[in-house]
Structures are given as structure tokens and as C-alpha cells.
Amino acid sequence: MAMGLRWGLPADLEKVNEFLHKTEPITAFLGYRLVELSEGRACAVFDALSNAQRVGGILHGGAIMTALDETMGFAALTLNDGDDQVTLELKVNFLEPGVKPPFKVCGQVVRRGGRVVVVEGEVRDADGRVIAKALGTWYYLRRRVEG
């Protein structure tokens, strides 16, 4: 996941969300929208329950992982200098069923090295219960993305 453009902080979240929905349509499908973007941190909300539920009316784990990947990737991106980046690893623990939207997902950089950054994330439901925790690693490719 990469923005493909150089934007500064604070970012115009409306423009970032518009760009994201155009270039990564799954975010629009999930009702995903960034609400916070600061150095080493990103938060978003999404209400995917009607589009991405499994039997029993529970939010699908793949939707949770997608929201974590996007948000944690944005947290890593805030420390990037405009180069492309990729997810190397993403480990998710599902702690509670996701049944109460809207869901809030946040990612926070834990450590940044030269080309590798470690990010932690979590998803909460409308009642503030943590439904998933994650730890991931992103790799900066050192190549510019046109966009």
C-alpha cells in the first residue's frame, strides 16, 4: 500500500480518502475512512458489517485484516519519504466477534529501522471493546511511486 504522492502532515484527510477509494476500491466497499493521520500513527473508521459479514452476522476476519493492513500501512507511510512500501508480515489475534459497528482501527509505529518498520494495531467496536490486535512489518522499497 502506498500513496504514490508526496503529501505532508497534517494531511487533508478528505483528499487522502478520495485518493484511497479511487486507487484501492476495497476501502470504499468496506466503508473505510481515515480520521487521523499524524507522525507514526493512523486511525480510521469502517462499517463493513452489511458488506462483509459471515454466518451469524459477525464481521468477516478478512475485512478486519484489510482494515488493519490499510491503517497500519498508513502509520508506516507517515515516516516514509514518498517511496513505495509493502507489507512483509501481518499477524492478527481475533479477540471478540465484531458485531457492533462502526469499528475504529488504529495503527502506531513501534520501531523504524532503515528500510523496515514495525507497527502495532487494534480494532475496537462501537462500545470500545477491542475485537482484534495486530503486529506487522513494512518494508520501504526505496523507489518512487508515480501518482
From Swiss-Prot:
The keyword Metal-binding does not apply. This is Putative esterase PAE1329. Transmembrane segments: none annotated. It comes from the Archaea. Its EC number is 3.1.2.-. InterPro entries: ACOT13, HotDog_dom_sf, PAAI_dom, Thioestr_dom. One of its GO terms (molecular function) is fatty acyl-CoA hydrolase activity. Keywords: Hydrolase. Pfam families: 4HBT. Belongs to the thioesterase PaaI family. CDD domains: PaaI_thioesterase.
